[in-house]
Amino acid sequence: MAESWSGQALQALPATVLGALGSEFLREWEAQDMRVTLFKLLLLWLVLSLLGIQLAWGFYGNTVTGLYHRPGLGGQNGSTPDGSTHFPSWEMAANEPLKTHRE
């Protein structure tokens, strides 16, 4: 008789634990509709992550931009110092006409 009582207690344990999380969660668990719960949790995670990124960018955005943006005559990311970028093959003679796509 004690075995049947402990078996019933073990079967009721998940319902008791899930009931502590909330009655709605318990109803969904009992209905075996965990897809809805998983979707809600993933959606909540996505929203919280995006809010965290937005908040962090608000605090540290200028610092990050300052690390990667170096104004000057170099390349777009400022990696070439003092305008030493020189590509003579890209230059054209002053008297040479501009070429169009059809040529």
From Swiss-Prot:
InterPro entries: TCTA (IPR016560). GO terms for cellular component: membrane. Residues 2-8, 62-103 are extracellular. One of its GO terms (biological process) is osteoclast fusion. Its main location: membrane. Signal peptide: none annotated. Residues 78-87 have a biased composition (Polar residues). The modification N-acetylalanine is found at A2. Keywords: Acetylation, Chromosomal rearrangement, Glycoprotein, Membrane, Proto-oncogene, Transmembrane, Transmembrane helix. It is found in: Membrane. Ubiquitous. Highest level of expression in kidney. Present in monocytes, osteoclasts, macrophages, synoviocytes and synovial lining cells (at protein level). Residues 71-103 are annotated as: Disordered. It is a multi-pass membrane protein. Residues 27-40 are cytoplasmic. Glycans are attached at N77. May be required for cellular fusion during osteoclastogenesis. It is linked to A chromosomal aberration involving TCTA is associated with T-cell acute lymphoblastic leukemia (T-ALL). Translocation t(1;3)(p34;p21). PANTHER family: T-CELL LEUKEMIA TRANSLOCATION-ALTERED GENE PROTEIN (PTHR32267:SF2). This is T-cell leukemia translocation-altered gene protein. It comes from Homo sapiens (Human). The lineage of its organism: Eukaryota, Metazoa, Chordata, Craniata, Vertebrata.
